[in-house]
Swiss-Prot record:
Presence of keyword NAD: no
Organism taxonomic ancestry: Bacteria, Pseudomonadati, Pseudomonadota, Betaproteobacteria, Burkholderiales
Xref: InterPro entries: PsdUridine_synth_cat_dom_sf (IPR020103), PsdUridine_synth_TruA (IPR001406), PsdUridine_synth_TruA_a/b_dom (IPR020097), PsdUridine_synth_TruA_C (IPR020095), TruA/RsuA/RluB/E/F_N (IPR020094)
The organism's place on the tree of life at top rank: Bacteria
Catalyzed reaction equations: uridine(38/39/40) in tRNA = pseudouridine(38/39/40) in tRNA
Name of the protein in question: tRNA pseudouridine synthase A
Keywords on record: Isomerase, tRNA processing
Annotated binding of substrate, by residue: Y112
PANTHER family, per the entry: PSEUDOURIDYLATE SYNTHASE, TRNA PSEUDOURIDINE SYNTHASE-LIKE 1
One GO process term, biological-process aspect: tRNA pseudouridine synthesis
Family statement drawn from the similarity comment of this UniProt entry: Belongs to the tRNA pseudouridine synthase TruA family.
Job description of the protein: Formation of pseudouridine at positions 38, 39 and 40 in the anticodon stem and loop of transfer RNAs.
Length: 270
């Protein structure tokens, strides 16, 4: 039995999140069915992912692992599994890893990117792939509010009521807000994220950007540790799991899908 790691990308618009469900309309169900078909239909295949994305959330870089007796070249895994996947899900790479590697528990950090369209009307060509806010936004105020969120905190004010995490303390290493033409690009990196945490952070930052709350509100909200005082959960459309960081011992040089996500649109984004 050997352990294989796969790097995935997917458009989450048509899927009800990553995690398997009885109805089978999830990314995990599609991936495991494709793996079983590639393996010859010898039985179910179980996978573990780095980060469980919600309904409508995308991934430019998702990492999974599985244990298998199947021996194939790395490129055979990529092309063979992709032959059984729908167009919106793709295996980008495959490689053998040691038994010590765990897609979820070995990860040091996860990075999410949120693409927000600031046009007067909703972005038809980005439907399902970018969030939208038509009101004018005070970006410097949003950046000032974001600084209060950096570091290790109890993020109870930004977790959903369905969150199953054992504790709400997370370390937010990075929260950048970049203006690129009609887009705002939010980049958030943390050791791990709570359920709906990124979308709740974006929603709160927009409250500040729209002038509905002062900059100091963000720190007060963080200290309150009460989700009921926060902003509504923002739409999932523009949210992408973009990078996973692992210790050097596992030999992953660069697992940043954000480069691929943004590079084709450099001109459009400014």
């Amino acid at each position: 039995m050997s352990r294989i790691a796969l790097g995935l990308a997917y458009d989450g618009s048509a899927w009800q999140g990553w995690q398997t469900q009885p109805h089978g309309v999830t990314v995990q169900d599609q991936v495991e069915a494709a793996l079983a078909s590639f393996a010859g239909g010898g039985g179910p295949v179980a996978t573990v992912c780095a980060g469980r994305t919600d309904t409508g959330v995308h991934a430019a870089m998702q990492v999974i692992h599985l244990d298998t007796d199947l021996q194939r070249r790395d490129e055979s895994w990529v092309r063979g599994v992709n032959a059984f996947l729908p167009p919106s899900i793709v295996v980008q790479w495959a490689r053998p890893v040691s038994e010590a590697f765990h897609a979820r528990f070995s990860a040091r950090s996860r990075t999410y990117v949120y693409l927000l369209w600031r046009g007067r009307v909703r972005p038809a060509l980005w439907a399902g792939r970018a969030g939208w806010a038509f009101q004018p936004l005070d970006v410097p105020a949003m950046r000032a509010a974001a600084r209060a969120l950096l570091g290790e905190h109890d993020f109870s004010s930004f977790r959903s009521s369905q969150c199953q995490a054992r504790h709400p303390v997370r370390t937010l290493h990075r929260l950048d807000i970049d203006e690129r033409g009609a887009f705002l690009v939010f980049t958030l990196r943390a050791n791990a994220f709570l359920h709906h945490m990124v979308r709740n952070l974006i929603g709160a930052l927009l409250q500040v950007g729209q002038g509905r709350e002062p900059v100091a509100w963000m720190d007060a909200l963080l200290c309150a540790r009460d989700r009921r005082l926060g902003a509504p959960t923002f739409m999932p459309d523009g949210l992408y799991l973009s990078a996973i960081e692992y210790p050097a011992e596992f030999g992953f040089d660069e697992l940043d899908g954000g480069i691929t996500l943004l590079s084709p649109f450099t001109g459009a984004l400014g």
